[in-house]
Amino acid sequence: MSDVRNVIIIGSGPAGYTAALYTARASLQPLVFEGAVTAGGALMNTTDVENFPGFRDGIMGPDLMDNMRAQAERFGAELIPDDVVSVDLTGDIKTVTDSAGTVHRAKAVIVTTGSQHRKLGLPREDALSGRGVSWCATCDGFFFKDQDIVVVGGGDTAMEEATFLSRFAKSVTIVHRRDSLRASKAMQDRAFADPKISFAWNSEVATIHGEQKLTGLTLRDTKTGETRELAATGLFIAVGHDPRTELFKGQLDLDDEGYLKVASPSTRTNLTGVFAAGDVVDHTYRQAITAAGTGCSAALDAERYLAALADSEQIAEPAPAV
């Protein structure tokens, strides 16, 4: 059993790094698979984080993740920027296979794989990705200087994308299916006050135009069905996220929206020794601070599980011969 670790954490972000910090401080020597592309989670694509406690003037998303990562590493967490391609979580010893085919074994697993950007599901959406269609304003905004840009969505992310893009763009049109926004009042006020931002209410993108690059959109009125053309060279999609749970289907229980189920208020899944935290579980709050909180809870749940497991193993050991 010498090659069996105490705990493996699949995923990063606030939940994964907090779980890594707590399990590392408990001397559990966690192995963390951060993800080859998604290391750090969604906050790596966020500009100012103004609502994470402890930072009076805010902090850049990547800086916050770098700080969390370094803190976990300081206490002994082993962090690997690699993907997990398969898992077997059903036995007492869990197996996790990385992209190189190496199999890692652990007594407990914490899942913090987060969520991914949701697509509109339209023809040309994927073909024009990187050619005018994007899901990340902080990544691609600079390339749209003095251009007409469209942002789709009505939540905080859409407002943040729009206000960030207004620094570069000639104009930003926010396309939203309804006649009011879901975003927080602070984010709404910021968008409404920006002279470069306008709104296309009760509208959805019906068609994406362009061969080699985006040239425009067809918008459809969600109430009347009428369509109109809108010239744009940039389309930023911010319509929500889907949980990254494909890896766990058939083993861990999922809800109707594909999120992992846990025995709330704990982070226990349906499989003994497997815990889940962050946006892979939460489709209600979806905040960095709540993800970090559940990452802490998952680490404590895993620590207590391992302690109970060690106690039971000691009890099961035969008494020495007299």
From Swiss-Prot:
Its EC number is 1.8.1.9. FAD binds at residues 12-15, 34-42, 51, 84, 279, 286-289. Coiled coil: none annotated. It catalyses: [thioredoxin]-dithiol + NADP(+) = [thioredoxin]-disulfide + NADPH + H(+). The keyword Disulfide bond applies. Binds 1 FAD per subunit. GO terms for molecular function: thioredoxin-disulfide reductase (NADPH) activity. Disulfide bonds join 136-139. NADP(+) binds at residues 176, 182, 259, 286. GO terms for cellular component: cytoplasm. Pfam families: Pyr_redox_2. Its cofactor is FAD. Keywords: Disulfide bond, FAD, Flavoprotein, NADP, Oxidoreductase, Redox-active center. GO terms for biological process: removal of superoxide radicals. The active site is a redox-active disulfide bond. Component of the thioredoxin-thioredoxin reductase system which may be involved in biosynthesis of penicillins and cephalosporins and may be important in determining the thiol-disulfide redox balance. Homodimer. Belongs to the class-II pyridine nucleotide-disulfide oxidoreductase family. This is Thioredoxin reductase.
